[in-house]
Amino acid sequence: MRINNIIGIGLTLLLFAACGQQQQAKSVVKDFVADCLQQDADYLDFTDVDSTLSGSDSVITALRQQGPKGIQYAERKGKALKYIRANYLVNDDTLSATFYLDAEMTGVVAYKQN
């Protein structure tokens, strides 16, 4: 019985950590869209936060060049990136984008319109 309690507590803590991570990513993306892209958006949905190691420096540079000029992106620290996809409305247009966040999820490293 004691093992079951420990496992239950561990799973509960893991769930709370994952929820906090999801909320942190959403907040960073919303701030980025409002401040850097200067779009007043209504958010429809977000995917779950996930990790990737496939974002090489050349891919990040290419993604940054596709977007508007003058955007301040977060610095990439390490190889791992987090990403989240968002569907949102701007002026009655439905947009979809993938946002790549630094590992600590403090800022957007790059994004791409889907």
Regions found by a protein language model. Give the residues of each.
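Cystatin/cathelin-like cysteine-protease inhibitor module
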Residues: C19-N114
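Sec-dependent bacterial lipoprotein signal peptides
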Residues: M1-C19
